[in-house]
Design a protein with these regions (language model features):
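N-terminal Lys/Arg-rich, disordered targeting/topogenic segments
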Residues: 1-19
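Alpha-helical transmembrane segments
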Residues: 19-33
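Generic signal for short, ordered secondary-structure residues
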Residues: 15, 19-22, 110, 262
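Solvent-exposed, non-transmembrane regions of membrane-associated and secreted proteins
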Residues: 31-317
């Protein structure tokens, strides 16, 4: 007897190919829908953030009606009398201080909230300041734990743009020596997305000043460094933000030097350990790096016109 004939198999390549095409079409369709929903959500969040900021600006920038304030006549000061005891013997020369001492707000010894901030803090008591860079930023600054405002606007409503916030470790009971502000690097330019403009030398020369007013005092700052730094210890770009905020003069001096060495600009604006620093920090494409725009408070014996001329004349990339 001969072997039984094998049943010939029939392969339906065409049907399988059609199923594959249908599956790919479904996958691409789902991706398109999800992407569209995200884009719409981002657009809505951006619009809501802009509207919320605009309404708060109206409150913050509204002109205050002049009020009559009572004039306090200072009590007469009794001049010191000469000491009747023999002067103490001369001791060894005092060593220079190694730590910065707390400083009260000039003219606001008890840290009273200004009337301008009393108005905006009715919207949210977390509002502690207002940041202004002409033509770029005009936003409220809030403070709570560092996670809270990453995805919430200044009102506490969910928003992918987040809010500009002051580092949680910054104590405003006295004037801080370092103010660390964080904000998202939004592609729309919202929050700290516009800080990328400072990588253009011409822009920096034309916009070297920042206004940051807190609830307790106004502040005007001059930019001395623009850098992309690393948060990874051991990297040549590493800058320790903790040391920049340290009251230890040596630590602070070393951290300022490290920041200056990583700046893309070389400028003649000097920085001292006892200067009040303002650091605007945002993320970049690398998760372990940050863009930093660093400024110091303008000193009492300085004027903006002279500083601006100095920056335009001496700053190089």
């Amino acid at each position: 007897m001969g072997r039984p004939r094998r049943k010939q198999r029939t392969f339906y390549f065409g049907k399988r190919r059609n199923w594959g095409r249908c599956l790919m079409a479904v996958v691409f369709g789902v991706i398109l829908i999800v992407s569209s929903v995200k884009l719409i959500s981002y657009g809505v969040d951006y619009y809501n953030a802009q509207q919320a900021s605009a309404s708060l600006r109206e409150i913050y920038h509204a002109e205050e009606e002049p009020t009559a304030e009572a004039t306090n006549t200072p009590a007469p000061v009794t001049p010191p009398t000469a000491a009747t005891t023999a002067p103490p013997e001369a001791g060894p020369t005092a060593t220079p201080p190694t730590r910065l001492q707390p400083v009260r707000y000039p003219g606001n010894f008890y840290a009273n909230v200004s009337s301008r901030f009393q108005k905006v803090r009715r919207q949210n008591s977390d509002i502690i300041g207002w940041l202004t860079i002409d033509g770029l930023i005009d936003e409220a600054v809030v403070q709570r734990d560092n996670e809270y405002y990453l995805d919430r606007d200044y009102r506490g409503y969910h928003n992918v743009n987040g809010a500009i916030f002051l580092d949680e470790t910054c104590d405003l009971d006295t004037r801080p020596y370092t103010l660390l502000l964080y904000g998202h690097n939004m592609k729309t330019g919202a929050m700290f997305g516009s800080l990328r403009n400072y990588e253009n030398l011409t822009f920096y020369r034309n916009n070297p000043f920042i206004t940051f007013d807190t609830a307790y005092e106004d502040g005007r700052y001059v930019i001395f460094a623009v850098a992309t730094v690393s948060t990874t210890s051991g990297s040549w770009r590493y800058v320790d933000f903790t040391r920049l905020s340290s009251p230890v003069i040596a630590d602070r001096t070393n951290a300022i030097s490290a920041l200056l060495s990583r700046s893309i600009y070389r400028t003649q604006v000097d920085v001292a350990a006892d200067d009040q620093l303002l650091l605007l920090v945002t993320c970049v494409d690398d998760d372990m790096e940050r863009r930093v725009v660093a400024a110091r408070r303008i000193r009492e014996d300085e004027d903006e016109a002279t500083l601006e001329k100095l920056i335009r004349r001496t700053t190089k990339k």
